[in-house]
Amino acid sequence: MHILTAGVDEAGRGPLVGSVFAAAVILPEIFDLPGLTDSKKLSEKKRDALAEMIKNQAVAWHVAAAGPEEIASLNILHATMLAMKRAVDGLAVRPEKIFIDGNRIPEHLNIPAEAVVKGDSKIIEISAASVLAKTARDAEMYALAQRHPQYGFDKHKGYGTKQHLEALEKYGVLPEHRRDFAPVRNLFAQQALF
């Protein structure tokens, strides 16, 4: 008998701006998607194509997020756990078991769960969740780039690159920036002085 298993992964823990995303995915018993692996090992074009195939073939999937305010009030780890719980809670079908990428399990899932280090390279459901979380996170960065093109979010995806730090210096901190992350916090403190 096939056990309904969900894979859960996150995207966007390290950037200085935007939400942290998590996805939960339940795949059918027979599922083969050549090239599906950890989203970080895939080109953007391949990720986007795989994301559509995953959404079309999954038994259930859900993407959720925790925003910059939640990251600031909870810290990035707890905000990530919150996004993961939201992703699981949003599934239209309740899984019997959950595999979560990493070494921590969100509280109050009420479903048997197991943390799997490097699970996005080992368990296909986690690989699928990795792709959905990353494509959702990238979509947020493209939308932010449309509103604030001078920051280059479409290129660096919110990470603390030289280009991003220079834009922060020149244009200041946006409401979407994570004010508790050191480079942003330091600039925000400087701006508050003037």
Curated annotation (Swiss-Prot):
Keywords from the named record: Cytoplasm, Endonuclease, Hydrolase, Manganese, Metal-binding, Nuclease
> Any one cellular component term from GO for this entry?
cytoplasm
Q: Name one GO biological process term.
A: mismatch repair
Which reaction is recorded as catalysed by this protein?
Endonucleolytic cleavage to 5'-phosphomonoester
Sample GO molecular function, one term: RNA-DNA hybrid ribonuclease activity
Signal peptide feature range: none
Gene3D superfamilies annotated for this entry?
Ribonuclease H-like superfamily/Ribonuclease H
**Which EC number(s) are documented for this chain?**
3.1.26.4
The keyword Metal-binding appears for this protein: yes
Task: Please give the Pfam families that the UniProt record associates with this protein.
Answer: RNase_HII (PF01351)
Q: Which SUPFAM superfamilies match?
A: Ribonuclease H-like
CC cofactor note = Manganese or magnesium. Binds 1 divalent metal ion per monomer in the absence of substrate. May bind a second metal ion after substrate binding.
Q: Which family does it belong to?
A: Belongs to the RNase HII family.
Q: Supply the HAMAP family for this chain.
A: RNase_HII_B
What does this gene product do?
Endonuclease that specifically degrades the RNA of RNA-DNA hybrids.
Full protein name: Ribonuclease HII
Q: Quick one: which gene encodes this? A: rnhB
